[in-house]
């Protein structure tokens, strides 16, 4: 399986994890390690920036993991830039998951503010991974603005509804020149497999693992699902559902003749 490359950095795993909703930091850490992921995102609002010994950080920081602070909770591009600068100073990384969703009920990303913030943050030297609507035109604009990836949603955050935007995701994947990370709404390993079979470069999962009866086992299931989907894509997955006429894999014609 090919390695994933983002901003010149190689990743063996194509599964990214979020850190919210786990019932304990210990379970969160066990799930992160079991998943084999190398990219972990954490909301700045959940971290005590003045406390270098913050207990949550102790469970996230490992040598093989790229920490990806996110700006969840900000409502404007201006707030996002301010939060990003704080994150860079606090965590010593210029990698950033950009999230701007002014509506606290549905947490849908604001496209105008996201594009504006991406342009500004790239100028400031950040590696920007923007969470965005599954809008092919917007994703191209974000790419042109210098985004290191685009992260279109599959469904609203935390809903576990799967690939509700699959038709738009296909277009985004086809057009993109940067990695496409399917983010939000992935609720089952089968959803992750489908996204990877479509050609997505990675999936970001949080709720489906964190609220599972056995989060560590679910993390392993997602790890295997992402690998299976990517292998199928790289192997040249056959067209599915486009031909309604049956075709035998081992016809008996010559044998009967």
Curated annotation (Swiss-Prot):
Annotated organism of origin: Phocaeicola vulgatus (strain ATCC 8482 / DSM 1447 / JCM 5826 / CCUG 4940 / NBRC 14291 / NCTC 11154)
Self-association and partners: Homotetramer. Forms heterodimers with either ThiH or ThiS.
Protein name: Thiazole synthase
GO BP of this protein: thiamine diphosphate biosynthetic process
A cellular component annotation (GO) from this entry: cytoplasm
Gene: thiG
Compartmental location: Cytoplasm
Record-annotated active site: 97 (schiff-base intermediate with dxp)
Principal place of residence: cytoplasm
Function: Catalyzes the rearrangement of 1-deoxy-D-xylulose 5-phosphate (DXP) to produce the thiazole phosphate moiety of thiamine. Sulfur is provided by the thiocarboxylate moiety of the carrier protein ThiS. In vitro, sulfur can be provided by H(2)S.
């Amino acid at each position: 399986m090919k390695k994933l490359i983002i901003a010149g950095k190689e990743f063996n795993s194509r599964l990214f994890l979020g850190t919210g909703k786990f019932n304990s930091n210990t379970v969160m850490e066990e799930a992160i390690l079991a998943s084999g992921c190398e990219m972990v995102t954490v909301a700045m609002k959940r971290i005590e920036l003045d406390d270098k010994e913050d207990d949550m950080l102790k469970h996230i920081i490992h040598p093989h993991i790229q920490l990806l602070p996110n700006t969840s909770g900000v409502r404007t591009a201006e707030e996002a830039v301010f939060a990003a600068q704080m994150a860079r100073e606090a965590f010593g990384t210029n990698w950033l998951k950009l999230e701007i969703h002014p509506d606290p009920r549905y947490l849908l990303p604001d496209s105008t503010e996201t594009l504006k913030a991406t342009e500004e943050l790239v100028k400031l030297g950040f590696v920007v991974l923007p969470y965005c609507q599954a809008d092919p035109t917007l994703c191209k604009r974000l790419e042109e603005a210098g985004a290191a990836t685009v992260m279109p949603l599959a469904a609203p955050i935390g809903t576990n509804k799967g690939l509700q935007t699959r038709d738009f995701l296909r277009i985004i994947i086809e057009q993109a020149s940067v990695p496409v990370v399917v983010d939000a709404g992935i609720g089952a390993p089968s959803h992750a497999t489908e996204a990877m079979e479509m050609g997505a470069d990675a999936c970001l999962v949080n709720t489906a693992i964190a609220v599972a009866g056995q989060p560590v086992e679910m993390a392993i299931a997602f790890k295997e699902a992402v690998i299976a989907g990517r292998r199928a894509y790289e192997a040249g997955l056959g067209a599915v559902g486009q031909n309604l006429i049956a075709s035998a894999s081992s016809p008996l014609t010559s044998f009967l003749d």
